[in-house]
Amino acid sequence: LCRQWNVRLKVYRENVPAYAKEHGMTEEEAGRDIRRTCFCKVLKEWGGTKIALAHHENDNVETLLWNLCRGTGIRGLGGIAPVNDVWIRPLLCVKRREIESYLKKRGISYCTDTTNADRRYMRNRIRMDVIPYLEDCVNTESVSHMGKTMERMYELEQYILEEVGQYKESCTGWKN
């Protein structure tokens, strides 16, 4: 696909299970760690400034539900930050099924992390059991509603941080 669309591609092959064992983490965490390390290498090598990740609205809802179950504050209610340093997430307002439908209509294949189907991970149980239950039995638009709530909570957090920063500056003359 990259060759067909003339998009540069760099492929890394890593032993995720070995890395996980060596670093005392789950394969899910190890895969994420390795991907991020590789992304940063390519960013530097190619002189980029941002790395776009494919997190979508369903991922964000999984994060919200997981945060709620563990207890969270306003930051956790905002879900995944759309921009965090070099990391950008332009698909947070798009549902997984919309992305899959788009790809299917165009005959574009995609791959997913193999750990995504492993029910040992709580995030996967939220994805495979809780969210479908909410959509089937509570509200078919549960994901959209939670997505909009997270947007508002994220904006509220940003507003509070800005206001606190300005107040701190006015009281102390200290700038961030």
Give a label for each model feature.
Residues 121-176:
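ATP/NTP-dependent adenylation/nucleotidyl-transfer catalytic domains that generate, transfer
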Residues 1-131:
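Core alpha/beta nucleotide-donor-binding catalytic domains of modification enzymes
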